[in-house]
Structure formats: structure tokens, C-alpha cells
Amino acid sequence: MINIKNILIVCISLVMYSIVFSSCKSDDIASGIFEIATKDLVVDVDKESTTVYIPVNSSLTINDWEVDYDKSWITHGKKRNSLVLSFEANPGKTKRTAAIKVTSPVAEYTLAINQYGPNDVVITDDKDVRVKPTSGIGTNPSGSNTIECTWDGSPRPYMTYTVPATLEYFFSGTEVIDYIIYAPTSTGNFGKLKLYTATAENPEYTLKGEYNFEMKSESSTIHFTTGIKATKIKFEVQEGKNNMAGCSEMEFCTKTITLTQQLLNVFADITCSELKPDINDDAIEELPAEYFKRIAYALKNNRYSEWEKEFRVQEYKAYSNNEEWATKLKIKKYTDLDNPTGISVEKGDELIVLVGDTHNQSIYLECIDEETTSSNDDHEYQRPAAHGHTFSLKPGVNKLVMTSSGQLFLIYTADIFSPDAQPIKIHIPLGSGKVTGYFDTEKHKTNEKYAELLSKATHKYFCIRGERIMFYFHTDKLQEVVPHKILPSIDFWNNIIKWEQELMGIEDIQPSQMNNHLMAISPEGSYMWANDYRIAFAKSTLYKILIPEKVMSAKDNVWGPAHEIGHVHQGAINWPSCTETSNNLFSNYVLYKLGKYCSRGLEISKLADAYGLKRSWVELGYSELYMRMQWQLWNYFHRLGNMPNFFPELFKELRANPLTFNNPGLAQLQYAKAVCKVANMDMTEFFERWGFFREVMLMNYEDYGKYMYIVNQGMIDQAKVYMATFSKKVPPIYYLEDRKNGDVGIEDYKVGDVGYYTQFQDNVKITGTPTYKLSGSKITVNNGTQAVAFEVRKGNENGELLYFFNFLSYTLPQTVLVDGIKFYAVQADGKRIEMKEE
């Protein structure tokens, strides 16, 4: 009985406790927090399958609230602070809707779901009207196709054999022309041109504008700020592809304004990025397409997320013509993809692009996809393409169909000094492409913002724009290597480019006149390379170059990228035999500026060996040796302060008077003469040591191409006569060395005991009497530390030079016969002192 009584007491107690606990818990739930913000109660999604996260501010567990809906194309999940909604792709042609009820003991909410169908913007009904000329005349055609072929709608092109060329069109003067579309041919594509117009009120031609179609294979468009009733229009084509002028079709068009007027009844401007004041739902419902209603409601109800809007609505600035500046500066072409949009697309996507005032400038969207290549590797791999399909944009509504997947870049090339080179506002609205974002150091500024944008990126590649360089690297690799900080990386490489640019003397040009960027990509194969439009660092190498501390941890981590960027900049000082070495002037300069590692390149003893064998410059045989010639010049003129602007001035001289690249023997001597001219110095001895004055005839010399490499005695004599016109002679800087054994980064080089640059800097004199001992072919020098080198000559100090060395103990090569020779210690100023045998 006692046990039964006790059991009953325990059971009753448990029931009472459960009732009390349940009551307390219910009270806790009822007084808890469960909130969904008003702005999140309407969910707009595109037609593609997607997942969205609705923020929930809740103190409840996920079991305390319920989600209910009746649509099979929706699924959901619950997290502590969010409702996860997934939507299947909309297969229909129109918007579909749903209601989702979210119920809790604290509050209830109903979410309105709008999943849009395909783009329903129709602009064909308002198709612009083509104004046909009444007649025309042009420069004599190359065949039977006359200028009439440019407006007859046929594929027959009009072509002239020469430029300049003139195309002149006549009109009734009663129809307004708002813009002109030029369709090129397969050759003769227009470059620079002038456009003249006349009207009934002003019957004489007046210059309407100067344009550059850049000889593109795509159509180009000229937009008039205000339409004109032209009586005649004249094109003066100043340059064309292959020195010809060709036109497949010239369309003169009048814009219809119905759609524009409807949009401007609701939106503040044609970019549709802002509503007019006091716009109500009735006005929005009058818009001609569901597409524009979506934009309007998103703006009105604050449902256009700031992240989306930042990239979908932008003002794009003008960038200089990278092709023109490459020619002027003797460099490889920088990128023209300076304006990322942060929008990615898939092949077949329909896009609406809303363009504001273009200020009479031509602009394009370019879609950058991937390309498959194998380069020199044994396997194919992917990398971003240098170029993609371009779409000409006009002010107002543009409807485009993407021909490939990729990211979009706005191409806005102009004379950046022109008052018309103003920023252009463009809106790529909701439902057109997908926001992936990009990071811009000028706009976004902080590492925190970078980390946020990178974490939201949706595309395979993420774009980072700095002052002078752009990265277009794999998103996953950036998230792995630099997930939180990018400013140290971008600043590091901006500095390297800045240093290279200052060495080539364009600090007054870039970025004030030429503001294009260098673009770096991350191929999935190869290693590192440079070409027009981009430089490449393989995806597998990004960990080496994106963290400055990692870059500085190994000499080659700096050298490789600086070498590739040097390829972009070497043009003015390059000729066949130097392609893989003249760029290393920049690499060594970058090492010097960073301050940790010594310079790179073979020792002077290797030059001595080549000299002793009477080898010419082109036959020196070591790429690591060639680079020392330029570096000796830099040390003498820059480091020693003899002419701190020497290389900038040399680059300017060689841009004004370029080397004859296809005649490398001549180019070699042109370079030597240019050095003399800029330095105002007789550099004969310097270039004599480097083999410039040895005859050579190589009929099939290879250096990224085949060349005839000829240097004959007549060419040599002519160069020497020119050099002799300069009264000041160069000191023996061909013996200058800026490294000592044991320097950080010296590697396996044995650089000698004398000739260090400070001896030239201090103009050290030989105060003692250098002596030597010979034991077979081994020579030991005593009291010679004040010399910069030691020479082996026949006869006196002006006798034939057989060999030289910069060690105090050295084994002479077997080609140097010790009988009948003399040894001389060379002083920093060039004085030779005969050494006595002990």
C-alpha cells in the first residue's frame, strides 16, 4: 500500500509540474520575439531557379513557428534567424505568384511571392524609322558597287582603294535623323573620321563631330543629342583598315518616342533608376511591361537591395584609347576592359540595358567568356578570353540577346580631355543578368568591404580594380588565399607598375592622359606570361603573388611577375636578341625598389669569357648575361646620380626615333647611339666590351620570329664616328658590379672581389702598387683592392685587350697565353696602372 501511495504522489507531482512548466513555456513563447521586416514581405525573383534568405528576428526555436503554402514549385527550410525559400525555374511566359504564411504564437506574416517570366519588354512595335537618302556621291569605288549600295539593304559593299575617302549623302530635309549606324565590311573598316551636316536653314556643311570607329568589325553608331533635319551628310574617312574605306550599309534613323515617353511618365530619367516624386500604384500600372512595373515597385517600396543596385546602376567614366597609346608609347596594349559592370550572364539571356545621355560618345557592352587553349602545355585548359562579343548601346532602351556566357564590361573609349567625355549613367535592371559584383579600391576603399563583396560573388571570376592594375582572378582562389584583405596586394602591384612606368618616363602621361589599366588573369594552365591586353599568373601561382609577405619570401616570386609586366613595357628598348632580357631592366629595378634582394644576372667573368672568344653581342649566349648591360647603365646614371633621369629620357628618345626592329643589327647600333646622345657621352668602350662592334651575319636568327642579323664593318665605323663626336668618355662602368658575395639573393653567383659600384661613386684612386704572381694559368693579385678590374693586354695600356677579370685570385682560360702579355689594374676613372710581377 505504501509503495502504491508513493507512486501516486510522484505521478501527480509530475503531472502538476508538467502543467506548470508548459504554462510557463507558453507564457515565454507568447512574450517572445518573432519579426519579419515589412520590406521583406514581398519577394521578387527572376525566372531562373534560385534560393533566397528572408531575415527573421526571433527568440523562438524553429519548432515554434510554421510555414505554409500551396505551390509545388516552392520549397523551404528554417534556420534560427532566417527563412530559406527555394524556387524552381518558371517555365511559363508570364509572372507567377504565391502566398506564403508564416505563423508563430507571437505574430503571423504573409509573404507575397512574384516569380517573373521571360523579359516582356517589346520594342519592335516602336521600331525606329529608317530615313533613306535621295542620292549620294563618294570617292571612286574599287569596283562596280557604287555608294547607292550603302542604303539599298543588300550585302553588296561600297569600297574605295584609298583613304582619305569621302561619302556624301543627300536628303529631302523633311525627316528628323537621330542617329546613324555604320555597318563595316570585311576590310576597309572605318577608323578616324569627321562628320559634317547641313540643313535647309544652314545649307553649308558644318563639322558635327570627330569620331574613331577603331576599325572594329562590329557596327558603330553616332547619336545626335538633338535630331536634325539634314539636307546632306558627309563622312570624311581619314583612316581605314588596310588603307581602304569600306561600307556595307549606312543607316540613318529616326527614333520613335512612345516607349520613352511612357517610361518618363513614371521614372525621373530614361535609366529608370529613380521614380518621379509622388508616383502612385496607378501610374506604375500604366507602364507598358511587367518588367518596368517590377523596377518601379522595387524602387517605390524600397525592395531594390543596395547590393544589387550598386552594380546595376552605375556611372561609367571614359577611358583612353589603349590601341593608340600602345603605338605612341611602344608598349603592349593595356586592357580596354576598364569598366566592369559586376553583372554576369548566360548564353541566350535577354537583357534590357537603359542608357542615359551618352554625350555623343560611342559605347559598347562586351561579354567576356572563357576560351580553351593548350599554349605550350600538353593539355587543354580554360582562361578568360581577351575579347568577346560586343553590343553597341544607344541612349534609351536597349534589348540584347547574349551570344555567350560571361561577365559584362562597358567599353567607353574616348579622348579623356574632351568636354564630352563625361560619365554615362547606365542601368542594367533587375531580371537582366545576375549580380556578382566587383571591388574597386577608389569606390569601396576598405578590406572589410572587399571581404563582403567577395563573399557575395556568384561568378567563377571576381574583378578587382586598383589604380593601375586590375585582377580578374578565380573567385574560389581569392576566397582561399585572400578572403579578408586585398588592399596590401593591390597596393603592392600598383607600386610595381608605377615604378616600371616611371622608369620608362611616362609619369606625366599615365594616368592623366592614358588611364587604362593592366589586366591580370589567372589561367588554369601554363605559368606566367604577358601579351597584348593582359598578363597572366596561373591559378596555381596566385598564392605566391597575392600576399606581399609571400611575394617577398622568395626572390623569384617578385622577379617573375615584374619580368612579365616588363614585357609589356620593354618595346622602346627592345630588338631581337633582347626579348627575354631587356624587360629585366624593370625586374632588377623592382628588386632595387623593394630593397630586400640583390639584382640578378650572370657575373662579369661570363662577359670576359665571351669577350675573350671574340663573340658579338648577339652571340653572348646567356640571357642572364644580356640583362647586365642595361643594369650597368642604370647603376652608373641613376644609382650613382650621374643622370637620374637617364632611362626616362632614353625611352623618350627611342619613342621619338624608334629602333628598326626588323633589322636587329641596325637596331643594336641605333640603341648604342641613342645612349650616347641621351648621356651626352662617348660610350664606345662600353659597347665595345659588350660585343656591339663585332661583325656578325646570321641569316635565320630566331627570337620569337626569324630575322637576318647583320652587323658589318661599315655600320660599326659609322657608329664609332658618331660616338666620337661626344667629348666626354665613359668611365669603365662595363666592370661595374652592384653585388657582393653573400648578398641576400646572390644565389650561386660569384661576382668578384673588386668593381663594386661604390668605387665608381667615390672615384677611388689606386694609391698603392698592385702586383701579381703567376702559377701556370692561375694569377694572384696583391694590393689590388682599389682597382675596379684587371686587364690582360698585349703590349702597353692601349694594346689589344685579351681578357679581363675582377677577382684577386683567378684562373685564366686556356685561350689566354701568358707569354708576352701585361696585366693592368683599372682605376674607377679609367686610368690603367701596369702591375708588376712579384
Q: Which residues does each predicted region cover?
A:
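Bacterial Sec-dependent N-terminal signal peptides
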Residues: 18-42, 75, 105-131, 254-261
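Surface-exposed binding patches on compact interaction domains or structured appendages
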Residues: 28, 33, 55-84
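Beta-strand-enriched, solvent-exposed domains that form extended recognition/catalytic surfaces
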Residues: 265-437, 773-837
